[in-house]
């Protein structure tokens, strides 16, 4: 049976860069240029902090995440950070985000990058995938603190 989804590192299909930047922008409102700059740094091997995507059978992006130095919080010592984790609503509940998270952690570990961190307000989701709560952090422009997790 054919796999319903394809999981990939952006370096496997760099031609998706513009579509990926537009997709992440549509989900999070961060300017496309910011995504493009990070993706270019990764594709040009200026950094090993990557971008990971899930495509459906039609080649459409249905989920993704990135890894950046700092994800808009006050603990700049906790780096790098998983960012922009998103799965299209119609594709949720299928373990896609978990596979992407694992893919990123394994890839980073293979490059000697560990631990990795993420900021979220979700409780219970990331723990299922081996993430551990570390502390509360203040996210830029947010009145309430957010949860910081780590994975080794």
Where are these regions (language model features)?
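Active-site rim helix/loop that mediates acceptor-substrate recognition in acyltransferases
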Residues: 28-57
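Short hydrophobic/aromatic beta-strand or adjacent loop that forms the aromatic wall/cage
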Residues: 49-50, 143-149
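Conserved acetyl-CoA-binding loop-helix of GNAT-fold acetyltransferases
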Residues: 84-87, 93-106
């Amino acid at each position: 049976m054919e796999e319903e989804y394809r999981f990939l590192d952006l370096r496997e299909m760099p031609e998706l860069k513009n579509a990926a930047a537009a997709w992440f922008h549509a989900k999070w409102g961060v300017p496309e240029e910011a995504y493009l700059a990070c993706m270019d740094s990764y594709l040009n091997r200026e950094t090993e902090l990557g971008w990971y995507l899930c495509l459906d059978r039609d080649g459409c992006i249905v989920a993704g995440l990135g890894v950046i130095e700092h994800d808009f919080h006050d603990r700049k010592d906790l780096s790098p950070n998983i960012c922009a984790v998103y799965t299209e609503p119609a594709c949720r509940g299928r373990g896609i985000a978990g596979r992407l998270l694992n893919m990123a952690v394994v890839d980073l570990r293979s490059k000697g990058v560990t631990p990795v961190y993420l900021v979220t307000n979700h409780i219970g989701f990331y723990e299922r995938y081996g993430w551990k709560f570390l502390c509360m952090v203040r996210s830029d422009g947010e009145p309430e603190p957010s949860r910081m997790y780590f994975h080794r």
